[in-house]
């Protein structure tokens, strides 16, 4: 991460210099080793008229990760300048929960264009999630997860992971469901690695699953993730069918949002003749989050 304002200014000056001289290959190389959050910061802090050009220099996968880190105003500005092909490429690289977050922040005209260029599967999923109340677990869940059947072998499970795992945001935690999608158990990739290839999933899964409902408060779910040290929390509908997961990243976003609101309320209550909190820096860190195994 970029730690110092001085370093940030040096990067901004270098970017401005290279952009003016149209040394685009060097600009691209400058961004390559950076984290998406740092690139987004540089784009936000730099000259607005340069942002579309600089963004287009990024590799496709990096561009999508940077896009998620940008402020909604910058996202909207870029979308308005995207060709249909460029918009489709960005959407293809986004995880579903990130796409939902973006849609929720955009004006109606931009939302219509996003949904028009999204795949039918993403469009359906976005519309499904947007039906849930804003403060519910359903509104922040990710509908892209990896499920297994209890009569699969460990070898079968690994084949399934290799086949579809690359398209998912997380494959560290796996869920076991019956043919009607009712949640039966949970296990980690570590469990699979330590098992024999011919072991059945039913034999190594943990049937005692901690889950939440789509209607549960999202802050309660975020706190539960922290309490149980989970990487993800399975989310079920009213018929107890598995419909999504809330990851630790989603939980961190919720906790940061709630903390920001709390600080703003505190600041509003302070007398006007005293200093008040103008900016909050939140460091919510989750380390070594693993699912307890039996």
State where each predicted segment sits.
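Hydrophobic packing positions in regular secondary-structure scaffolds
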Residues: 1-270
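Cytosolic-side membrane-insertion boundary helix
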Residues: 264-286
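Conserved small/polar residues in nucleotide/adenosyl-binding loops
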Residues: 287-293
């Amino acid at each position: 991460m970029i730690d110092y304002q001085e370093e940030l200014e040096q990067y901004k000056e270098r970017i401005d210099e290279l952009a003016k001289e149209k040394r685009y290959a060097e600009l691209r190389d400058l961004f390559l080793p950076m984290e998406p959050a740092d690139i987004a910061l540089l784009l936000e802090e730099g000259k607005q008229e340069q942002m579309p050009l600089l963004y287009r220099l990024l590799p496709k996968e990096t561009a999508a990760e940077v896009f998620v880190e940008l402020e909604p105003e910058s996202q909207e500005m870029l979308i308005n300048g995207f060709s249909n092909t460029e918009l489709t490429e960005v959407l293809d690289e986004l995880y579903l929960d990130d796409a939902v977050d973006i849609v929720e922040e955009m004006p109606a005209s931009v939302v219509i264009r996003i949904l028009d260029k999204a795949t039918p599967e993403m469009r359906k999923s976005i519309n499904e999630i947007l039906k849930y109340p804003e403060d519910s677990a359903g509104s922040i869940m990710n509908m892209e997860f990896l499920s297994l059947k209890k009569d699969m072998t460990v070898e079968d499970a690994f084949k399934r992971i290799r086949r579809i795992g690359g398209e998912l945001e997380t494959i560290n935690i796996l869920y076991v469901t019956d043919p009607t999608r009712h949640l039966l158990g949970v296990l980690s990739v570590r469990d699979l690695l330590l098992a024999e290839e011919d072991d059945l999933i039913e034999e190594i899964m943990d049937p005692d699953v901690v889950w939440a409902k789509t209607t549960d408060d999202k802050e309660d779910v975020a706190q539960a993730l922290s309490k149980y040290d989970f990487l993800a929390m399975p989310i079920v509908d009213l018929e107890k069918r598995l419909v999504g997961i809330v990851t630790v990243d989603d939980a961190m976003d919720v906790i940061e949002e709630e903390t920001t609101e709390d600080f703003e309320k505190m600041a509003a209550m302070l007398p006007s003749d005293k200093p008040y909190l103008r900016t909050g820096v939140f460091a919510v860190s989750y380390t070594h989050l693993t699912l307890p195994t039996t």
